[in-house]
Amino acid sequence: MRHYEIVFMVHPDQSEQVAGMIERYTGSITEAGGKIHRLEDWGRRQLAYPINKLHKAHYVLMNVEADQAVIDELETAFRYNDAVLRNMIMRTKAAITEPSIMLKQKEERAPRREAEAKEFAAE
């Protein structure tokens, strides 16, 4: 089995369905004997450039270990799902399990935002 990093972007109007999509895709990987090493839901983020006249999308990152047949199945699922705007599947040399830079930045900003909210509420 090979290691892959998968990133897909979902239409912002379909953000509620992202949890179901993640469950479906991870289920197909694990049913085929694959493993999920890292799963991150980055949430709705600004796009670098408009895609289909959209300026935001919901991002999901997965690092998996799976067979090529499972990856082909995922690629087909992404292609025929209208809610998936873009996807990228890259083969990696080893399993990546540490949090990504995006998640680290999000975690660093959370306490600062809470402190700012408390200051604003106190005023």
UniProtKB/Swiss-Prot annotation:
SUPFAM superfamilies: Ribosomal protein S6 (SSF54995). GO terms for biological process: translation. Residues 102-123 are annotated as: Disordered. Keywords: Ribonucleoprotein, Ribosomal protein, RNA-binding, rRNA-binding. Residues 104-123 have a biased composition (Basic and acidic residues). This is Small ribosomal subunit protein bS6. It comes from Vibrio vulnificus (strain YJ016). CDD domains: bS6 (cd00473). HAMAP family: Ribosomal_bS6. InterPro entries: Ribosomal_bS6, Ribosomal_bS6_CS, Ribosomal_bS6_sf, Ribosomal_S6_plastid/chlpt, Transl_elong_EF1B/ribsomal_bS6. Binds together with bS18 to 16S ribosomal RNA. Belongs to the bacterial ribosomal protein bS6 family. The keyword Amino-acid biosynthesis does not apply. The gene is rpsF. The keyword RNA-binding applies.
